[in-house]
């Protein structure tokens, strides 16, 4: 018996929310026509913790332990932007040695973030081996962090006017040894992945973003540079002491998932170049600006009040934010990480707006996956590189 062909029913599929160790608790409601994606709706908010409101009820020093929970795989950057804003508001000079230490820590954190992007990205498209390889190198980075800060993650190392502690004896030599070893590791990754025909089949020409389109969507970081736009805030804004080092902006013009992979792999090599130059040229001197203490509010406790009775308590620094507004930004591993800060002549910010790169970059996902195959969703989502801690805040 012959039946007339009728229009197929569309199928709605839920993807996620997954465990935070992968891309995080992101839920995608995907509408399918067979294997083809018709529509995709991201559902956010599963990891929302009210980070902006918490900032309005804490001093900057009290808030520092919270910020490491935004992007919990690149915590040095969230700490850096948290102290950079008040430093610019108060016109506080950072000692040269502290600036060099900051650059070293930021670039090590960039390498660790890119490594933990590479492993799950390869696992998403079916390659399990690199997922285990990247932990080998990442463990060495975390050993360096632990030796310098006491913590493998959530370091709480940056301070207004410098860093919390100087580098321990022998740390610079240990870091130089890591740089030499890691360059051979990147060569191994490129042999294993970059020219792999199965890998190229999965990523080449998938999720293409043009240069003008990337600018219109407000993309930043490797997402923008993979579309042919040479834009890196380390070169544009001249923050810390990046101008003193010889390095190049890494970019590609194809705009597909392969281009985003190549940009991040190349950025790790550039980070090693920056770290090596910083280690060889790091000056002596103080690691913090002691003049920051003059910003502390004078205490004149009355008899029988809390501060008088508990005279032995260690006071928290009360850096007062002047009545101004400021937007501070920096080049995080995932893109432009910024804060919009409004001071109100008190120790607490009146407004603390976070501009997370992952949240902005994620907005283009529904457009990229339309008319693609279902299996390509994980390739495109993985190439964007999101952490839901900073997306939901």
From Swiss-Prot:
Its EC number is 7.1.1.-. The gene is ndhH. It is found in: Plastid, Chloroplast thylakoid membrane. One of its GO terms (biological process) is photosynthesis, light reaction. NDH is composed of at least 16 different subunits, 5 of which are encoded in the nucleus. Its main location: plastid. NDH shuttles electrons from NAD(P)H:plastoquinone, via FMN and iron-sulfur (Fe-S) centers, to quinones in the photosynthetic chain and possibly in a chloroplast respiratory chain. The immediate electron acceptor for the enzyme in this species is believed to be plastoquinone. Couples the redox reaction to proton translocation, and thus conserves the redox energy in a proton gradient. It comes from Gossypium barbadense. GO terms for cellular component: chloroplast thylakoid membrane. This is NAD(P)H-quinone oxidoreductase subunit H, chloroplastic. Keywords: Chloroplast, Membrane, NAD, NADP, Plastid, Plastoquinone, Quinone, Thylakoid, Translocase, Transport. It catalyses: a plastoquinone + NADH + (n+1) H(+)(in) = a plastoquinol + NAD(+) + n H(+)(out); a plastoquinone + NADPH + (n+1) H(+)(in) = a plastoquinol + NADP(+) + n H(+)(out).
